[in-house]
Amino acid sequence: MSLGFGLGLQYSKLSDGGGFEGFLNQFPGASLGLSLRLLDRNYTGFCIKVRRSSDNNELDIGFLNNELDIVSLLNFVGSGDGKVIIWYDQSGNGNNATQITASKQPTIVGNGSLILDNGKPAILFPTNLLGNMSFNSVNQTTLLSVASILSFTQVNYVLWSESAAKGFFYGGRLRGVNGLGISDGSIKSITEENLESKIAYFNYNGTNYDVAENGNSVTALPNGSNFPSDSVGRPNISEVEFDGKMQEIILYPSEQSANKVAMENNINNRYNIY
C-alpha cells in the first residue's frame, strides 16, 4: 500500500534559490545519478521510496535543504525498520534502482534509527539477503561512488551487469581481490583495501580501466573492457553480494578523466572522507 507523496518534496526547492549548484549542474551529462543528497537544482522528484516494517505501507521521501528529508523519513518509519524499494535516478533518464522483493530490500532506518556512514545517511545492504537493486541497462565510461564494506568474506560488487556478467567491486579477500577493482572476464584490483568509507573512481580510457580511491592517482588495470551496468550490488550469490553501505553512485557515458579532481573534491566536500 502506498501513502503517496512525502513531505520532503515540498521543501526541496526552498533551499536552492540562493545559489545552490548540484553535482549534476557542475558536471552534466550523467546516465545515472543515485544519491542521498540533491544532485541537480532542477530535479523536482523524490530521493527514495521507503516501506516501513510495521505495516508495509510505503512513502516517497524527498529532500530538505538539498539533503534527504530525514524528518519525514523517521516520522514515517517510526520505531521499526525502513526498507528502500526505489532509489530514484536524478539524472533525468528515469533509471530508478528498484527492489520489489521485501526480503531483499536494503535498509535506511533500523529499529527507528537512521543508518549512517561517516555521519551521513546511508543505505545498508546487509549480507545473506542476496539482494540488489535493478535499473535499466546503462552504458558507463566513468563511475564515481561513495560506499563502505563491512566484511572481506565476499567480493563486494557495488555495481553489476547481469547481461554481461561483469562488474565493479569495493574489495573482499576472495578470488585474489585486494581492493577496488573490476571483473570483466578476469578479476583485477588495486591494493588499498580496508573497511573505511571510500570515494571510488573508475574510468575506461579505451584500453584500460583507471581506478583510484579517495582522490589518489589512478592505477591502470590492464586489458580492461567497457560494459553496461544494470544492478546496484550483485544478486543471488552469497560470495559476491555487496555487504556494506552505499551513499552515492554516478555514471557517465563519456570519459570524464579531465574532471576527476574536481568531481572528487565536490564529493569529498559533502562526505568528508579524506
Regions found by a protein language model. Name each.
Residues 3-6, 42, 47-55, 63-65, ...:
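Extracellular, beta-strand-rich glycan-interacting domains
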Residues 1-2, 6-16:
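Intrinsically disordered, compositionally biased repeat/linker segments
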Residues 181-183, 187-188, 225-251:
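Extracellular glycan-interaction patches encoded by glycine-rich segments
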Residues 37-39, 77-80, 85-128, 137, ...:
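Extracellular glycan-interaction surfaces
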Residues 61-85:
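Aromatic- and Gly/Pro-rich amphipathic surface segment
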Residues 42-54, 123, 157-160, 229-231:
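Short, hydrophobic/proline-enriched secondary-structure or compact coil segments at domain edges
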Residues 12-46, 51-52:
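N-terminal module-boundary/linker segments of secreted carbohydrate-active enzymes
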Residues 13, 50-62, 127-134, 164-170, ...:
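Short, surface-exposed beta-strand/loop "edge" segments at domain boundaries and coil↔beta transitions
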